[in-house]
């Protein structure tokens, strides 16, 4: 049973270390006034999209903000124009939901167990844009999410790969092989004859 604690502890630590970044996706959010609204996340962090929500009837149904959100490439992000319906990520289309505002979450994980899930990589940026459902204006809400990663250093120019090899791999190094001869002194045939001759003489009649 004690072996089960290790993966469970690792899972709990990873969940505890993950941060959640909240984005209120509506036209009144001042952060969308800038063209470069950017969030920096780490792997396993979450981005929570909070959809527009109206608790009273002071706003006409036709004026309630609703959006289709897309996950697009950089060029489409700059143009604020998706290329395919396959890029649809979510829909904010329940502005008067009784349970409160809809929350749409993206986990920026390296691997996903889901077939249609999205996988993210360190050091890459991902782009979200939206198109309004409630009206036909061209105002673009867009978000850039950058997954921060570790900086990897390339090997130094003075590193010599020969120094990292085992000594036995160097042909100029003399090594003792396992099939080498024994270090015990050898007895030549003449010496064996001298030693055995007295025994042979004792056995003759």
From Swiss-Prot:
Where is each Ephrin RBD domain found?
A: 19-151
The parts of the chain that form a coiled coil are none
Major localization listed first in the record, in broad terms:
membrane
**What are the record keywords, sorted?**
Angiogenesis, Cell membrane, Disulfide bond, Glycoprotein, GPI-anchor, Lipoprotein, Membrane, Secreted, Signal, Tumor suppressor
Q: Which residues are the signal sequence here?
A: 1-18
Cystine links in this protein are 51-92, 80-140
Query: What do we know about how this protein assembles, alone or with others?
Result: Monomer. Homodimer. Forms heterodimers with EPHA2. Binds to the receptor tyrosine kinases EPHA2, EPHA3, EPHA4, EPHA5, EPHA6 and EPHA7. Also binds with low affinity to EPHA1.
What the record says about family reads:
Belongs to the ephrin family.
Protein name in UniProt: Ephrin-A1
Underlying gene: EFNA1
């Amino acid at each position: 049973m004690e072996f089960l604690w290790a993966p469970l502890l690792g899972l709990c630590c990873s969940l505890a270390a993950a941060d959640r970044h909240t984005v209120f996706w509506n036209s009144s959010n001042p952060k969308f006034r800038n063209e470069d609204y950017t969030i920096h996340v780490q792997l396993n962090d979450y981005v929570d999209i909070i959809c527009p929500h109206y608790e009273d009837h002071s706003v006409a149904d036709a004026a309630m903000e609703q959006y289709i959100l897309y996950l697009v490439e950089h060029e489409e992000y700059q143009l604020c124009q998706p290329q395919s319906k396959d890029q649809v990520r979510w829909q904010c289309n329940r502005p008067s939901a009784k349970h409160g505002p809809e929350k749409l979450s993206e986990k920026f994980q390296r691997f996903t167990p889901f077939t249609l899930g999205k996988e993210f990589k360190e050091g890459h940026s991902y782009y979200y844009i939206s198109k309004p459902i409630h009206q036909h204006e061209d105002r673009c809400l867009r978000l850039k999410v950058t997954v921060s990663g570790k900086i990897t250093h390339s090997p130094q120019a003075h590193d010599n790969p020969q120094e990292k090899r085992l000594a036995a791999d160097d042909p100029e190094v003399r090594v003792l092989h396992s099939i080498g001869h024994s270090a015990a002194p050898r007895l030549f045939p003449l010496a064996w004859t001298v030693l055995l001759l007295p025994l042979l003489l004792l056995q003759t009649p």
